[in-house]
């Protein structure tokens, strides 16, 4: 039976462009498999939060074409997504896409799609908290030393300078990485070889308008690895690990998105290191109850395995690591969509109706409450 799919893309997010690129590649893959999947509709959220809907081919390709679609109010857009038996495959990267926002909408509306649990996505967008969870779940797993700038610093430049000076003293001349806590794609992430107080303050101030939580981490030199994980046939499977080789030893936004700045080394045969990466990835994926698929990033330094972050909706664009890992495992993007739809059918559904017995009187007077000491 052919699977009907709605592609949901765009979003009011700093990763809007990544969503458009993932959409184009996935749409092309789905159109190449007409006997397996039917593209039922395209739902686009503009950068400003408007909703556009397309239910017939030819499907939009450019952002101008997407913006020219039927403009819908929110309630009607949600109604169309929940109407019928189509599976909604979300490509909403970043804020308001994979941070728990749309996952909550999907839970409340029983929206059939690859959204998954609220907590897994919310945790997946919070680098500081997921590091705490990861260390607890995987014995021996390390994370870089981290300091978080208090949100109030965005309104107090003097306090920001004082905080930055204190962190610079704790770093004691060691290089640092400054990054937003709740953004993806390494946006606004900077390496500071000489993290003086003023340098830390400037880098933190640049990120604060986009995220009220900014992290300063001690830079750990080493080799970066990324591991994809998918649910196939009801089982959690680690994909072949990719080692990221860069000229400057750091995998930032430019390295991830400009051709030739990173040399991905695909490990089709496991080593001791890649086995450790896979084991940690599967454990974290399962324990965090991530839905469908994810990508997890690690770093190895002096034989110590450092956890960097989990991405609960990795990019599917050309040049992204996740499709490369899928291909090495004998899978493609059409398989991924089909597996997500099958996994949705296998998910556990909580019973939310339970008798809640209350033995107190229906109404109590003020005098009775005062007498009882409440």
Describe each model-derived feature in a short phrase:
Residues 104-112, 194-198, 329-331:
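A glycine- and small-aliphatic-rich helix-loop capping segment at beta-alpha/alpha-beta transitions
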Residues 111, 139-141, 290, 331:
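Helix N-cap/coil-helix junction residues
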Residues 3, 271-374:
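ATP-dependent carboxylate activation and anion-phosphoryl transfer catalytic cores
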Residues 2-9, 78, 123-215, 221:
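Active-site nucleotide/adenylate-binding loops and adjacent lid/helix of ATP-dependent enzymes
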Residues 193-279, 300, 304-306:
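Phosphate-binding site of ATP-dependent enzymes
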Residues 1-119, 123-125, 129, 150-162, ...:
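ATP-binding N-terminal substructure of ATP-dependent carboxylate-amine bond-forming enzymes
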Residues 106, 130-134, 326:
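Structural element of the ATP-grasp superfamily
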Residues 59-60, 233, 314:
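Short, surface-exposed beta-strand-loop junctions and turns on beta-sheet-rich folds
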């Amino acid at each position: 039976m052919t699977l009907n799919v709605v592609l949901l893309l765009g979003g009011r997010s700093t990763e809007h462009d990544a969503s458009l690129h993932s959409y184009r590649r996935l749409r092309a893959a789905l159109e190449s498999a007409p006997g397996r999947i039917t593209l039922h509709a395209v739902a686009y959220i503009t950068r400003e939060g408007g909703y556009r809907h397309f239910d017939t081919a030819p499907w939009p390709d450019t952002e101008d074409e997407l913006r020219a679609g039927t403009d819908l109010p929110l309630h009607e857009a949600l109604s169309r997504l929940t109407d019928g038996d189509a599976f909604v495959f979300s490509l909403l990267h970043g804020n308001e896409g994979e941070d728990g926002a749309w996952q909550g909408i999907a839970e409340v509306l029983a929206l059939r799609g690859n959204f998954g649990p609220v907590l897994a996505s919310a945790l997946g967008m919070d680098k500081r908290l997921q590091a705490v969870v990861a260390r607890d779940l995987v014995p021996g797993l390390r994370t870089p030393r981290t300091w978080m700038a208090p949100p109030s610093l965005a309104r107090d430049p003097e306090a920001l300078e004082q905080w930055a000076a204190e962190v610079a003293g704790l770093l004691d001349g060691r290089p640092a990485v400054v990054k937003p806590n709740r953004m993806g794609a390494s946006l606004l992430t900077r390496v500071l070889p000489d993290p003086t107080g003023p340098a830390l303050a400037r880098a933190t101030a640049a990120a604060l308008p986009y995220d009220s939580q900014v992290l300063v981490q001690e830079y750990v030199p080493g080799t970066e690895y990324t591991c994809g994980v998918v649910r196939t046939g009801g089982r959690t499977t680690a994909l072949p690990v990719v080692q990221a080789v860069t000229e400057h030893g750091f995998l930032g936004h430019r390295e991830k998105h400009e051709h030739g700045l990173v040399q991905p080394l695909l490990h089709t045969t496991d080593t001791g290191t890649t086995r450790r990466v896979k084991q940690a990835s599967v454990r974290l994926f399962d324990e965090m109850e991530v839905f469908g698929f994810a990508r997890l990033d690690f770093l190895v330094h002096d034989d110590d395995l450092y956890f960097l972050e989990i991405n609960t909706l990795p990019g599917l664009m050309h040049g992204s690591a996740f499709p490369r890992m899928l291909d090495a495992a004998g899978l493609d993007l059409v398989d991924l969509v089909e597996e997500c739809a099958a996994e949705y059918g296998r998910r556990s559904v909580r019973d939310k109706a339970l008798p809640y017995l209350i033995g107190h009187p229906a109404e109590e007077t003020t005098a009775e409450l005062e007498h009882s000491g409440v």
